Amino acid sequence: MPKQVIIPPGASTPIAPFVPGTLADGVVYVSGTLPFDKANNVVYPGDPKAQTRHVLETIRHVIETAGGTMEDVTFNSIFITDWKNYAAINEIYAEFFPGDKPARFCIQCGLVKPEALVEIATVAHIGPSGGA
């Protein structure tokens, strides 16, 4: 099955050469997602909970556009700028994954815009019937 580019309706234009998601063989690969509005400005500066919620809602939109749900998520790569925000980020993260949690890792690093506190990249296995 050839890969499909996944661009949800109303998605912002990426600030680099990538797409929000790619579907291949029933797997959705969601690009690193930052707390950006449609004009690529950081939303909710200084608020790790609101930024995390925005990021996960954006990821959900990509996965749903591909035909999946957040229950299909199998792996998340989480990048945070400060460990002091770890508990707040996890609080919101747990709301999006209330049952069995996907595998993940979390590292502290700098992000492309200094006001961004969190970035998440995701893999979801939606199966052969999924697709945009």
From Swiss-Prot:
GO molecular function (one): deaminase activity
Known function: Involved in pyrimidine catabolism. Catalyzes the deamination of 3-aminoacrylate to malonic semialdehyde, a reaction that can also occur spontaneously. RutC may facilitate the reaction and modulate the metabolic fitness, rather than catalyzing essential functions.
The protein's Enzyme Commission number: 3.5.-.-
Disulfide bonds: none
InterPro entries: RidA_CS, RutC, RutC-like_sf, YjgF/YER057c/UK114
The reaction(s) this protein catalyses: (Z)-3-aminoacrylate + H2O + H(+) = 3-oxopropanoate + NH4(+)
Alphabetically ordered keywords of this record: Hydrolase
Family membership: Belongs to the RutC family.
GO cellular component: a single term: cytosol
Organism: Cronobacter turicensis (strain DSM 18703 / CCUG 55852 / LMG 23827 / z3032)
Gene3D superfamilies: RutC-like (3.30.1330.40)
Protein name: 3-aminoacrylate deaminase RutC
Pfam families per record: Ribonuc_L-PSP (PF01042)
CDD domains attached to this UniProt entry: YjgF_YER057c_UK114_family (cd00448)
One GO term of the biological process aspect: uracil catabolic process
Coiled coil: none
Enzyme type, top EC level: hydrolase
